[in-house]
Amino acid sequence: MIGDMEITKGEDIKSYALEVGYKKQEKDLFRVSIVDKELNQEQIILRNDAGVFVVTPSLNQIFKFEGNWPLNSPKPYLLQSIVEIAQKKEAKVEKEDDGYLVSSRVHYPNNKNFYREEIMFDKEAKVKWLQIYNKDDVAELKIAFKKVKYDAPIKDTYFDVPQTLDKKASVSAIQEEDLPLYPMMLHGAQLTNTSRMNINGKVKHVLEYSGDANFTVVQMKKDSVEKTQTVIMPGQMIDVLDMVGFYDGNHVSAIYDNVEFTVFSEDLSPDEMMSVITSMQVAVMK
């Protein structure tokens, strides 16, 4: 399936090109490509017989995870999730001139704002578009599918992990001088201290928060490596559509626009720590 995806966070709207491939076999194969149109940065998530991989050409790195992605939680762009929603008992189906409109309450564990979803199918039951709304009935996610083929023949090599990555020219919106970014999602905490550390020529920015929940944010600009690297990632992968993070013990890390964000906390859940990181995309606060 090929389409365009829009994610709205407050006044910020991000546009992505989306391509999803799936092949059913003893161990199902998946490939999801998400390209940030503004930054021209691509991230590919693969599942094959060797495991789960997040391919990040802008850093020339491949991250390998354990786990059952993507079937461990629903994903709006997955046909399996779309069908599951359409088949819910409480789903409402309305016949339209050009197909069928399905509407249902939804629950996405990694996207707690998502409340209600509409899915439009054509007369041949091919999905045309979907929109997900929050409790205020504001659309936070839109996907318009341009090409949909069920049971299309796909070669196994489509799901192979690339040995070398093509570092396409990309635009980085976040520069070193923009750091640190400040999260909007604070979980009842307030900023109590900021500091900088210089480690091996790299600057790490540290933000400490205290209150209902205590947590620390560390952020650092990442440089692309010369030779393609595969990095084995410990812990649990967390996928929030436009960003992939991993949880290991008391912290969650994620890379966005070549900046590595890490949240340390004994009080926040993995999803709450990830929500702190994703809230930094909305605005640069000084």
Which residues make up each language-model segment?
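Surface-exposed amphipathic alpha-helical segments
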Residues: 137, 144-146, 150-154, 262-286
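Short, surface-exposed coil-to-beta transition loops
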Residues: 13-18, 39-42, 112-117, 139-142, ...
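Short, solvent-exposed recognition patches
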Residues: 162-257
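Gly/Pro-enriched, hydrophobic low-complexity segments
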Residues: 97-163
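Flexible, processing/modification-adjacent segments and terminal tails
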Residues: 47-111, 115, 154, 159
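Beta-strand-dense domains in secreted/periplasmic systems and polymorphic toxin scaffolds
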Residues: 32, 130-132, 263
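An acidic-aromatic
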Residues: 21-76, 134, 138-147
